[in-house]
Amino acid sequence: MTQQLQSIIDTAWDNRASLSPAAAPKEVTEAVDHVIEALNNGQLRVATREGVGQWTVHQWIKKAVLLSFRLKDNVLMQSGDLNFFDKVPTKFAGMTEAEIAATGVRVVPPAVARRGSFVAKGAILMPSYVNIGAYVDEGTMVDTWATVGSCAQVGKNVHLSGGVGLGGVLEPLQANPTIIEDNCFIGARSEIVEGVIVEENSVISMGVYIGQSTPIYDRATGETSYGRVPAGSVVVSGNLPKDNGRYSMYAAIIVKKVDAKTRSTTSLNDLLRD
């Protein structure tokens, strides 16, 4: 079934210029709808983990997400007295109290998750935003005004602090999703974008910005890397000298490895997860 879906999606992607809500083969619309539903219930995900820092990205699923926008018209959506005009309904729209309770997710108003995102049991959505294609795993808290971008992957027992932004893949178009692995703590107002991977058990301090072009400097080894924060790192914002000290440029600095003291200040509160 998956191979058949992939074949239909790949072919539709190659012919996407000819597609519209009024002019799309039935098998294409059904295939795209099937993928979005599978993303919504966690049966499919845009990327799957093979090991620490090792992920396989399923580009055909990302293509299906993009195609869904071409195949749908904007429609009126309502929430109380508020009107919206969009192509993607919210994840919990039309669900009963019992159905939402069965998901095991706590959703604090006015949090929004779009249909086609997955939020696992034990996760908490404070007033935040989870975009289509994103995956939020068990026990994770998405704190107030945090944004989980399209197709971003967030692991188990992660804390995304207030105002954190995880970049999406839809616009500007990115090849790979942003990934936060298990047991990470992302400090307030930090931004992780452009397919950067933060490996498991890492702590990103407040106000750290990491994209593919951001130098990630390890002060213990003197090494500079890009696009990946090694497992168990504690990262703060800083600067590196350039041009023989004439000026400095922004960098993310690995100041140490996570220790017991770090864990005590970034541990999750079980009382919030009862």
UniProtKB/Swiss-Prot annotation:
InterPro entries: DapD_Trfase_Hexpep_rpt_fam, Hexapep, Hexapep_transf_CS, THP_succinylTrfase_dom1, THP_succinylTrfase_N_sf, Trimer_LpxA-like_sf. Its main location: cytoplasm. It catalyses: (S)-2,3,4,5-tetrahydrodipicolinate + succinyl-CoA + H2O = (S)-2-succinylamino-6-oxoheptanedioate + CoA. GO terms for biological process: diaminopimelate biosynthetic process; lysine biosynthetic process via diaminopimelate. This is 2,3,4,5-tetrahydropyridine-2,6-dicarboxylate N-succinyltransferase. It is an enzyme of class 2 (transferase). The keyword Amino-acid biosynthesis applies. It comes from Delftia acidovorans (strain DSM 14801 / SPH-1). One of its GO terms (cellular component) is cytoplasm.
